[in-house]
């Protein structure tokens, strides 16, 4: 369904028979000015999400209590007897969580926090909206609070020196980095200061002048910093040594496409530092990167020059290539202790978090993690890759003549009072398309019938996207977007998701529908599809009814397509011969 062709269609004829939708009331003028005008004294970043999140949590707790409050079935929260303190969280941090509107851990948080509090590597694969971000932030902050700063220069403001305890969180894009920073800084003490400070290094943001406890970065930005002019590698060495906890948020994206080589390379560097530290402790001698000839500086420096565009690119510009984890950064001409010694004393913890983590095949993200971290603890959500029972599904087959009216009817349906819980604030509807052109076309259609909407796609500037996303969070309305808004972004209380064009793959489908029914709430997903998608939709619905992974439906479609292609090729070959 190529919606961008609608720009050249006689819209007036199609829309003449449709009732004009009443526009949403505009926000108060004072509030609008506050959103659009640059502030000289911006409010603390944690206040942006505190109110919507508190509303969402309260509503979910009420629903959970009405269902028995035992955490069973389709409940979001853990059992009533499970508290933050019972998971190993200190009273101080538990108080900060209560202050942020998080009175009780979710099922996923209750499952993963005790494991992350240990020294084990952990892989958290759980459905969207299950509380994964706080699932790793809470134990990281707990560890950082409990660790005493023993280094002599612990009061230094240089991010590469001082405390030997830094948590590193890697995210695929700028918006997700800033979101994680907001969520970390929302956990404050009695004075209103964050328990542990977090800062982002991504996009236009340079390296922080004041050392944070939690550094959130895109792989490209981090590599560019580590490989700046540093002849003795001291900056890189100090940073790698100080990082004790590493989180890979949206791990499935970070381990494929344009991010794969960058992330694997960072893992090599961190593991190499672990081996150096292990050898130093065994020998009792100081060993640095500058003392190891096997660490190949030149090739690393050349491949470290990455553009800022890489942070926003998800289309796989860097080709896949096999990587030997154990032998990274080792000269091919030497076989020293690092090449033959596979057992070494661990000094870092790795945590991988994802809402979609396919494991079928060695090249999938799940397959890569199984090989690289065979001893990691896996924590899986109850509805990973499966239908969320809190979702109301609506499936509508459309043609070129009915797709516009079906889209407008879907938008109208989500605006009904009986569909949207007004206690959760303004109505929020997300309309997904497959391309930027289609998003622009849908926006034009909605504007022509009097429905204000906000655009969010990759052709918009980073500043425009940030402003539009904040407006959507604060004021609600209709957000017309591509899959750039499908992953990672936490917008509380989205009541309705509309697929104006059906998703092309299982990952996109799961992330789209995961924008609603988050944090224990209910939600609606309306999927418009054409005859070309009919078999795929039938397979998806069957998988949901049988509580099977949705990804298999898309795999069957791909296998069927490949089979048809092979048959067509054989026929062409036979005709030519």
UniProtKB/Swiss-Prot annotation:
Domain Helicase C-terminal, first and last residues per copy: 407-568
SUPFAM superfamilies in the cross-refs: P-loop containing nucleoside triphosphate hydrolases (SSF52540)
GO molecular function, one term: ATP binding
GO-annotated cellular components: chloroplast
Regions crossing the membrane: none
Limits of the Helicase ATP-binding domain: 113-375
Catalytic class of the enzyme: hydrolase
InterPro entries per UniProt: DEAD/DEAH_box_helicase_dom, Helicase_ATP-bd, Helicase_C-like, P-loop_NTPase
Gene3D superfamilies in alphabetical order: P-loop containing nucleotide triphosphate hydrolases
SMART domains (UniProt xref): DEXDc, HELICc
Record motif DEAD box, residues: 249-252
Pfam families per record: DEAD (PF00270), Helicase_C (PF00271)
Key words of the record: ATP-binding, Helicase, Hydrolase, Nucleotide-binding, RNA-binding
Keyword Transcription: no
EC number(s) from the headed UniProt entry: 3.6.4.13
Motif position, Q motif: 82-110
Catalytic activity reported: ATP + H2O = ADP + phosphate + H(+)
Protein family membership: Belongs to the DEAD box helicase family.
Name under which the protein is recorded: DEAD-box ATP-dependent RNA helicase 22
């Amino acid at each position: 369904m190529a919606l961008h062709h609608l720009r050249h269609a006689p819209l007036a004829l199609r829309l003449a028979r449709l009732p004009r939708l009443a526009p949403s009331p505009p926000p108060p003028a004072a509030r609008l000015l506050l959103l659009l005008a640059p502030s000289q004294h911006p409010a603390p970043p944690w206040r942006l999400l505190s109110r919507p999140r508190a509303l969402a949590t309260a509503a979910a707790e009420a629903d959970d209590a009405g269902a028995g409050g035992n955490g069973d079935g389709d409940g979001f929260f853990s059992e009533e007897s499970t508290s933050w303190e019972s998971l190993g969280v200190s009273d101080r941090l538990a108080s900060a969580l209560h202050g942020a509107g998080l009175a009780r851990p979710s099922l996923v948080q209750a499952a993963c926090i005790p494991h992350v509090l240990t020294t084990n590597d952990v892989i958290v694969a759980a459905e969207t909206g299950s509380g994964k971000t706080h699932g790793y932030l809470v134990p990281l902050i707990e560890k950082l609070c409990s660790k005493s700063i023993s280094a002599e220069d612990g009061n230094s403001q240089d991010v590469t020196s001082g405390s030997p305890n830094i948590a590193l969180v890697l995210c695929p894009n700028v918006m997700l980095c800033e979101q994680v920073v907001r969520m970390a800084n929302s956990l404050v003490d009695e004075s209103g200061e964050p328990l542990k400070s977090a800062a982002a290094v991504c996009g236009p943001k340079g390296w922080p002048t004041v050392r944070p406890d939690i550094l959130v970065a895109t792989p490209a930005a981090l590599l560019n910093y580590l490989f700046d002019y540093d002849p003795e590698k001291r900056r890189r060495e100090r940073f790698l040594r100080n990082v004790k906890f590493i989180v890979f948020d949206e791990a499935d994206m970070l381990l494929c496409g344009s991010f794969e080589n960058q992330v694997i390379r960072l893992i090599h560097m961190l593991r190499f530092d672990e081996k150096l530290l292990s050898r130093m402790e065994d020998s009792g001698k100081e060993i640095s990167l500058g003392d190891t000839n096997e660490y190949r500086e030149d090739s690393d420096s050349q491949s470290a020059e990455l553009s800022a565009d890489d942070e926003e690119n998800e289309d796989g510009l860097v080709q896949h290539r096999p990587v030997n984890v154990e032998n990274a950064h080792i000269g091919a001409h030497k076989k020293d202790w690092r090449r033959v010694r596979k057992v070494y004393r661990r000094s870092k913890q790795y945590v991988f978090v994802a809402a979609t983590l396919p494991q079928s095949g060695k090249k999938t993200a799940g397959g890569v993690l199984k090989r690289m971290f065979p001893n990691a603890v896996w924590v899986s959500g109850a509805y990973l890759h499966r239908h969320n029972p809190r979702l109301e599904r609506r499936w509508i087959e459309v043609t070129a003549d009915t797709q516009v009216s079906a889209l407008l009817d879907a938008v109208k349906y989500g605006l009904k009072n009986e569909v949207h819980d007004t206690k959760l604030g303004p109505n929020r509807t997300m309309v997904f398309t497959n391309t930027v052109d289609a998003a622009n076309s849908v926006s034009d259609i909605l504007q022509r019938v009097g429905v204000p909407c906000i655009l969010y796609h990759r052709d918009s500037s980073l500043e425009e996207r940030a402003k539009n996303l904040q407006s959507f969070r604060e004021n609600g309305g209709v957000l017309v977007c591509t899959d750039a808004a499908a992953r990672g972004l936490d917008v509380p209380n989205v009541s309705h998701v509309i697929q104006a064009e059906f998703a092309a793959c299982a990952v996109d489908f799961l992330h789209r529908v995961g924008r609603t029914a988050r944090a224990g709430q209910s939600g609606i997903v309306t999927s418009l599809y054409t005859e070309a998608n009919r078999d795929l939709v039938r397979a998806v619905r069957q998988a949901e009814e049988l509580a099977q992974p949705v990804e298999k439906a898309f795999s069957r479609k791909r296998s069927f397509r490949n089979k048809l292609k092979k048959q067509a090729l054989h026929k062409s070959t036979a005709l030519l011969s």
